[in-house]
């Protein structure tokens, strides 16, 4: 059950933030025989968040509030409840309770909003039940909830491969950035359909695999990272623009700000731009807000 309304936090509740996920690069290696796509992605996390709290109890439910509460969908489709149920199938006598979601991140936006919420739910249930984050039962529940949920459980910069299950931590520095979403939802399945890979078809060569890349060490300057990231791409960007042409406009406006790097995240429609300093990021965000007040714009950091 999902109820929309106020989400008053009580002192006995547990709380977690759900950070937006940003794909700095995204290669589609190919489509497997089972229909899933193997991916290679450098993932960072932004400082824009949803907030999720848990009042531990016996009955599982979700109360949604915040400016995007109406976008949480039906209970059968909500990833917070799905993750909790999947963990409950694997952990006997799991304490669940009432989740309260303060929803701010856009949905169907390529920044893992629903996945980040589900990951926060798993972290809350782990705390409420004394389960380690690395517990195989929790990891399996995360994987079955959705491809982006395992990386969102960790919520730290990494290289993500496979169907999202293999994670390699990265020492990414904090990078000033702007995120822009034109408030147009994009269905991931539509973008992959537009990519058009057949089952068993490869999209990149063996020599392109991301595991072979030697990434900068922790503490390396941002310029070193930007040089590496600039060599990357998002393979879903062209098909996403075919599905929603406004994504091309978002990218054009970001690139016109003088950003160091601009790209689409995930399957869209959110795009990001990285800047040399926070002032430039704030100025770019303000310019875009004034020009396109209907768009969602966030200036902050990626790390």
Curated annotation (Swiss-Prot):
Coiled coil: none annotated. It catalyses: 4-CDP-2-C-methyl-D-erythritol + ATP = 4-CDP-2-C-methyl-D-erythritol 2-phosphate + ADP + H(+). Gene3D superfamilies: 3.30.230.10, GHMP kinase, C-terminal domain (3.30.70.890). ATP binds at residues 106-116. The active site is at residues 21, 148. Its EC number is 2.7.1.148. InterPro entries: GHMP_kinase_C_dom, GHMP_kinase_C_sf, GHMP_kinase_N_dom, IspE, Ribosomal_Su5_D2-typ_SF, Ribsml_uS5_D2-typ_fold_subgr. Signal peptide: none annotated. GO terms for molecular function: 4-(cytidine 5'-diphospho)-2-C-methyl-D-erythritol kinase activity; ATP binding. It comes from the Bacteria. Pathway: Isoprenoid biosynthesis; isopentenyl diphosphate biosynthesis via DXP pathway; isopentenyl diphosphate from 1-deoxy-D-xylulose 5-phosphate: step 3/6. Keywords: ATP-binding, Isoprene biosynthesis, Kinase, Nucleotide-binding, Transferase. GO terms for biological process: isopentenyl diphosphate biosynthetic process, methylerythritol 4-phosphate pathway; terpenoid biosynthetic process. Catalyzes the phosphorylation of the position 2 hydroxy group of 4-diphosphocytidyl-2C-methyl-D-erythritol. Belongs to the GHMP kinase family. IspE subfamily. PANTHER family: 4-DIPHOSPHOCYTIDYL-2-C-METHYL-D-ERYTHRITOL KINASE, CHLOROPLASTIC. This is 4-diphosphocytidyl-2-C-methyl-D-erythritol kinase.
């Amino acid at each position: 059950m999902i109820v929309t309304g106020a989400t008053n936090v009580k002192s006995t509740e547990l709380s977690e933030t759900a950070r937006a996920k940003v794909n700095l690069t995204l290669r589609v290696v190919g489509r497997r025989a089972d229909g899933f796509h193997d991916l290679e992605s450098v993932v960072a996390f932004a400082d824009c968040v949803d907030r999720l709290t848990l009042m531990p109890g016996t009955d599982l439910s979700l109360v949604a509030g915040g400016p995007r509460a109406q976008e949480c969908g039906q209970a059968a489709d909500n990833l917070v409840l799905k993750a909790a149920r999947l963990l409950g199938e694997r952990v006997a006598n799991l304490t669940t309770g009432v989740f309260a979601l303060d929803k701010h991140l856009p949905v169907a936006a390529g920044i893992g909003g629903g996945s980040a919420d589900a990951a926060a739910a798993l972290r809350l249930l782990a705390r409420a039940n004394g389960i380690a984050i690395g517990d195989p039962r929790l990891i399996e529940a995360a994987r079955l909830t959705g491809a982006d949920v395992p990386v969102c459980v960790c919520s730290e910069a990494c290289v993500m491969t496979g169907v999202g299950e293999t994670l390699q931590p990265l020492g990414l520095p904090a990078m000033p950035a702007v995120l822009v979403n034109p408030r147009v939802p994009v269905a991931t399945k539509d973008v992959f359909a537009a990519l058009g890979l057949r089952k068993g078809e490869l999209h990149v060569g063996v020599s392109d695999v991301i595991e072979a890349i030697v990434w900068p060490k922790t503490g390396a300057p941002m310029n070193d990272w930007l040089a590496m990231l600039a060599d990357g791409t998002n393979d879903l960007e062209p098909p996403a623009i075919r599905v929603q042409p406004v994504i091309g406009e978002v990218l054009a406006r970001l690139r016109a700000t003088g950003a160091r790097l601009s790209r689409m995240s995930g399957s869209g429609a959110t795009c990001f731009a990285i800047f040399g300093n926070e002032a430039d990021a704030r100025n770019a965000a303000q310019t875009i807000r004034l020009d396109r007040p209907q768009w969602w714009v966030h200036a902050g950091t990626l790390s």
